[in-house]
């Protein structure tokens, strides 16, 4: 449905992909963070419940247990603990599966870092600066947890401070029309791995909507591989390479960078962001995508998912973005 609305906007000459802005926003899951179970607590509780089950079984074998435990329904007490043990075992399996995925990712990153350091050592004949990277640790950490109400949701930091059970909803918005071009939901609290999936979505939309000229995103999306991926897609990246100062000296706004620059994707990006044109274009980012999130939350009242599970939440976010696009299209037609 989103595609149909975008196609309609394109046919009405209300949508043109020039500058697009990508960002993410945390939305509450339909689950309480107090229903989360950590691996450390699950292990301790599992041991406690097993000990209680053994004790209840011994009591059941004692001839005078009714006299010593008046009112105690041993079969019910046993079943209650065994049910909890089954839930704990299932939760630990989920945590351990996630840990294996985490370990595989960290191991791949570790091997890349080691390979880069070895290549530099072979090229220069000197040891690279800094300490050698540490290999990732195996096994779940005590703080690794799963939510028993919505296992797909994650504990995430919120913009107002603190943490909540949430999903990270992503959207790419076109500058002039402010229509949502791509939308997806992720379980990752940070955004750095969300740019490549967006590029894949934009690539699939090219036959219908064309290709954006420029993609703007904040520093959460910045990595050398991401910048290179945007360039490879034929799009100019405008991704903050670091946090900017809130109150720079006034003269910095009018400085022109030197012509020399590092001839790499990240080097070209840093040079571009120092130019007057680059800074002016990047400044548009927060006026493109952030108002969309603000209106969705404050005006449309969507702050929390009603459904549970990543697949269903994805569909719900698509529906919200569709509602925004229909609303926005009505405004554009009236201009």
Predicted regions and their residues:
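Anion-binding and metal-coordination hotspots
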Residues: 1-335
């Amino acid at each position: 449905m989103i595609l149909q609305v975008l196609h309609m906007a394109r046919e009405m000459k209300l949508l043109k992909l020039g500058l697009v802005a990508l960002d993410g926003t945390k939305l509450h899951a339909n689950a309480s963070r107090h229903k989360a179970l950590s691996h450390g607590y699950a292990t301790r509780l599992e041991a406690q419940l097993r000990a209680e089950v053994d004790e209840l079984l011994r009591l059941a074998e004692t001839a005078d247990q009714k006299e010593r435990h008046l009112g105690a329904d041993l079969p019910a007490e046993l079943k209650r603990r065994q049910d909890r043990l089954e839930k704990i075992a299932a939760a630990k399996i989920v945590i351990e599966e996630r840990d294996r995925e985490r370990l595989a990712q960290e191991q791949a990153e570790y091997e890349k870092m080691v390979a880069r350091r070895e290549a530099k050592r072979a090229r220069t004949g000197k040891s690279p600066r800094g300490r050698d990277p540490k290999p990732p640790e195996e096994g779940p950490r005590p703080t690794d947890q799963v939510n028993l109400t919505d296992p797909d949701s994650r504990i995430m930091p919120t913009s107002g401070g603190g943490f909540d059970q949430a999903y990270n909803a992503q959207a790419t918005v076109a500058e002039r029309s402010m229509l949502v071009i791509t939308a997806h939901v992720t379980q990752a609290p940070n955004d750095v791995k969300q740019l490549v999936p967006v590029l894949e979505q934009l690539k699939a939309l090219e036959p219908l909507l064309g290709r954006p000229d420029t993609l703007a995103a904040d520093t959460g999306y910045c990595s050398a591989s991401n910048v290179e991926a945007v360039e490879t897609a034929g799009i100019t990246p405008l991704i903050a390479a670091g946090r900017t100062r809130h109150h720079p000296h006034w003269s910095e706004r009018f400085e022109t960078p030197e012509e020399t620059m590092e001839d790499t994707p990240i080097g070209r990006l840093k040079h571009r962001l120092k130019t007057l044109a680059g800074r002016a274009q990047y400044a548009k980012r927060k006026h493109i995508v952030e108002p969309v999130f603000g209106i969705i939350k404050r005006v449309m009242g969507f702050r929390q998912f009603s459904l549970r599970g990543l697949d269903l939440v994805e569909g719900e976010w698509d529906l919200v973005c569709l509602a925004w696009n229909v609303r926005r299209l009505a405004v554009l037609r009236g201009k």
